[in-house]
Regions:
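Short, structured active-site-proximal loop/turn typified by the sulfatase FGly-forming signature C/S-X-P-X-R
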Residues: 74-111, 151-153, 361
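Active-site His/acidic residue clusters
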Residues: 78, 167-168, 230-238, 251-297, ...
Length: 394
């Protein structure tokens, strides 16, 4: 019998840990019913992941994070399943799904994503264009495995993420980070700053109008277009006119990167769902549906690109959740400011090479466990990370 979704909603008598466990169990039971997945055990045998030096050289990882997360009411619940048809029908049946991933850090999109990328709960100012304090996964990957800069990329829709690829760490830092593509900067450069017809693609921050980073873009971005992405200005602008959101533009850039550069470590941040801060419920739901579709499109691209098919693991996870309806300090779907269990307890799915298919795990883990897991799977050591490798993936 499917657990009544209402049972996991917050109450004054429940502790944050109890609420997190209820959320996890509710997601688990819903997915077992709706997607036909089985309850997994950490006592399973070794992962089917390919081992050996030759396999490691071909191994690729793609991480998709999306800003703000979405409530279970609009996703992993009977009343929300219509918004995630691709996840339920195509992605989750092929994945290992983790229902209780907690974020114990600061619930701001840049700082939370930086924490995901370093494996340490960063404490930087969420609205400052500064690099993470601790080494990023890209630096560990490139230094330990002696990989070139072309093998690690970040595609980020928000201008505030331009420092995400490289830390301030003296042991790593300068010259060892990922290359970062900001599609809004590409658009600004290609249009010579004439963005009047592209306002729906350059809106940068939904959370506070007081923080509006300048939309940059110049000769460097034009070189990225022409030399790396093999796109003419005319072709790029023509495609920009066909997309409806920043994340759609980002996914177009991602596909070009996969075709032209084929990086072994590719990190994508998506941000459309954070339009929830506008307070318009219909736009929030539309963004969930768009994100669901774009994730499925990315997985199809992975399977169709010769450099990625059969040797790629895809991770999809929100940076954190959203406030619960019942929390008097929040505003339901609109924000993530209370720090309650609903805003901190999210999920992750992994699918592709080496991942057990159609399995759901409900034990607690933390979002900072991602980087140590990537290191264990790819063969590098994230020495300063504070998370733990996810044993179900190893």
């Amino acid at each position: 019998m499917l657990m009544d979704f209402a049972k996991h909603r917050t109450s004054g008598a429940a502790t944050p840990r109890e609420i997190a466990q209820r959320l996890s169990r509710s997601r688990r039971d819903f997915l077992r019913d709706a997607a036909g997945v089985a309850l997994g055990s950490s006592l399973l045998g070794a992962s089917p992941f390919l081992r050996g030096e030759a396999a490691a050289k071909k191994r690729k990882m793609i991480v998709v994070t999306f800003g703000g997360g979405a409530r279970d009411q609009e996703t992993f619940a009977p009343e929300g399943q219509e918004n995630i048809p691709y996840m339920l029908r195509e992605l989750i049946p092929q994945s290992s799904f983790f229902t209780q991933v907690t974020n114990q850090g600061i619930l701001g999109h840049y700082v939370a994503t930086a924490s995901l990328a370093t494996g340490v709960y960063e404490t930087l100012n969420n609205f400052s264009a500064i690099a993470p304090e601790h080494p990023t996964v890209f630096e560990y990957f490139r230094k330990d495995l002696k990989r070139p800069s072309s093998d690690a990329w970040v595609v980020a829709p928000s201008n505030g993420f331009n420092r995400i690829g490289e830390s301030e760490s003296r042991s790593y830092g300068p010259g060892l980070g990922a290359r970062v593509v900001l599609p809004k900067h590409l658009l600004s450069a290609a249009s010579s700053g004439a963005l009047k017809d592209y306002q729906h693609l350059v809106r940068d921050n939904y959370e506070t109008p007081l923080y509006t980073p300048q939309i940059g873009g110049g000769e460097f971005e034009l070189q990225q277009l022409e030399m790396i992405l093999k796109l003419s200005v005319d072709d790029f602008m023509a495609h920009a006119r066909t997309v409806s959101s920043p994340d759609e533009l980002s996914m177009y850039i991602v596909k070009r990167l996969m075709q032209e550069e084929s990086p072994s470590l590719l990190w994508i941040t998506m941000h459309d769902i954070d339009i929830a801060h506008s307070g318009t419920y219909s736009l929030y739901v539309d963004a969930i549906r768009r994100t669901d579709r774009l994730c499925a499109e990315l997985w199809k691209t992975v399977q169709s690109e010769p450099e990625y098919a059969g040797n790629t693991t895809l991770f999809i996870l929100p940076d954190f959740g959203r406030d619960a309806d019942e929390d008097p300090g929040g505003n339901g779907f609109q924000h993530h400011r209370t720090g309650d269990a609903a805003s901190r307890t999210t999920w992750m799915m992994a699918l592709g090479a080496g991942v057990r298919q159609g399995v759901v795990y409900d034990r607690p883990m933390q979002s900072i466990d991602l980087v140590p897991s990537l290191g264990a799977m790819m063969g590098f050591s994230p020495a300063l990370s504070q998370g733990k490798p996810i044993k179900e993936l190893l």
